[in-house]
Amino acid sequence: LTCFNCPEVYCNRFHTCRNGEKICFKRFNERKLLGKRYTRGCAATCPVAKPREIVECCSTDRCNH
């Protein structure tokens, strides 16, 4: 599995996940409309969203754009 791993809106940097990491995720704060920063990467399970945070998970290559 390969997942994107950069904070910009338009991300083109990705890496190969380690064994056991079968999910790509993208998380961001729903309140920051301008200057939105993302956290992207690989995970074994989908991370839990904090208050006012959105977490999207998927399981195909480079799906966390």
Curated annotation (Swiss-Prot):
PROSITE patterns: SNAKE_TOXIN (PS00272). InterPro entries: Snake_3FTx, Snake_toxin-like_sf, Snake_toxin_con_site, Toxin_cobra-type. CDD domains: TFP_snake_toxin. Keywords: Disulfide bond, Secreted, Toxin. Belongs to the three-finger toxin family. Ancestral subfamily. Orphan group II sub-subfamily. Expressed by the venom gland. The keyword Protease does not apply. It comes from the Eukaryota. The keyword Lipid biosynthesis does not apply. GO terms for molecular function: toxin activity. GO terms for cellular component: extracellular region. Disulfide bonds join C3-C24, C6-C11, C17-C42, C46-C57, C58-C63. This is Weak toxin CM-13b. It comes from Naja annulifera. SUPFAM superfamilies: Snake toxin-like (SSF57302). Binds with low affinity to muscular (alpha-1-beta-1-delta-epsilon/CHRNA1-CHRNB1-CHRND-CHRNE) and very low affinity to neuronal (alpha-7/CHRNA7) nicotinic acetylcholine receptor (nAChR). It is found in: Secreted. Its main location: secreted.
